[in-house]
Swiss-Prot record:
CC annotations in GO: plasma membrane-derived thylakoid membrane; proton-transporting ATP synthase complex
GO molecular function: ATP binding; proton-transporting ATP synthase activity, rotational mechanism
PANTHER family, per database record: ATP SYNTHASE DELTA/EPSILON CHAIN, ATP SYNTHASE EPSILON CHAIN, CHLOROPLASTIC
Subunit structure as annotated in this protein's UniProt entry: F-type ATPases have 2 components, CF(1) - the catalytic core - and CF(0) - the membrane proton channel. CF(1) has five subunits: alpha(3), beta(3), gamma(1), delta(1), epsilon(1). CF(0) has three main subunits: a, b and c.
Function summary: Produces ATP from ADP in the presence of a proton gradient across the membrane.
Organism annotation: Rippkaea orientalis (strain PCC 8801 / RF-1) (Cyanothece sp. (strain PCC 8801))
Keyword Thylakoid: yes
Lineage: Bacteria, Bacillati, Cyanobacteriota, Cyanophyceae, Oscillatoriophycideae
Protein name: ATP synthase epsilon chain
Length: 136
């Protein structure tokens, strides 16, 4: 039995296929979804979503959204998403270093809005680096 997964952004379908298992970055922690999962609606955080195809795992970076499970269908509606195989480690590492520096600078200041923006950029860069295989 398989779980049908669709990852949808406002402008395209990033993933549409059957998987054995999915792990989502929910706002309350990592959430595993298997076939025959109970109906569920949850918020997603910025992070790495993993799907298992037979014995291989694929990573996708998701930038917040919602996930719905119903009748062996997992629909993931996100602001944006990238498949990990499409991200180069070098680019992801450069983005991560830049985001880390920006976050450190923002945390020295008192502008809360800039701190939040820098924190979001850091989470995105970290997720991209993880999906590219640069962080565990």
């Amino acid at each position: 039995m398989a779980l049908q997964v669709r990852v949808i952004t406002p402008d395209k379908i990033v993933w549409d296929g059957d998987v054995e298992e999915a792990i989502l970055p929910s706002t309350s922690g990592q959430l595993g979804i298997l076939p025959s999962h109970a109906p569920l609606l949850t918020n997603l955080d910025i992070g790495v979503m993993r799907v298992r195809l037979d014995k291989d795992w694929k990573s996708l970076v998701v930038m917040g959204g919602i996930a719905e499970v119903e009748q062996d269908i997992l629909q993931v509606l996100v602001n944006s998403a990238e498949i990990g195989d499409d991200i180069t480690k070098e680019d992801a590492q450069a983005d991560f270093s830049e985001a880390q520096s920006r976050l450190e600078e923002a945390n020295k200041g008192s502008d809360r809005r800039e701190q939040i923006k820098a924190s979001q950029a850091y989470k995105r860069a970290r997720a991209r680096l993880q999906a590219a295989g640069g962080l565990v």
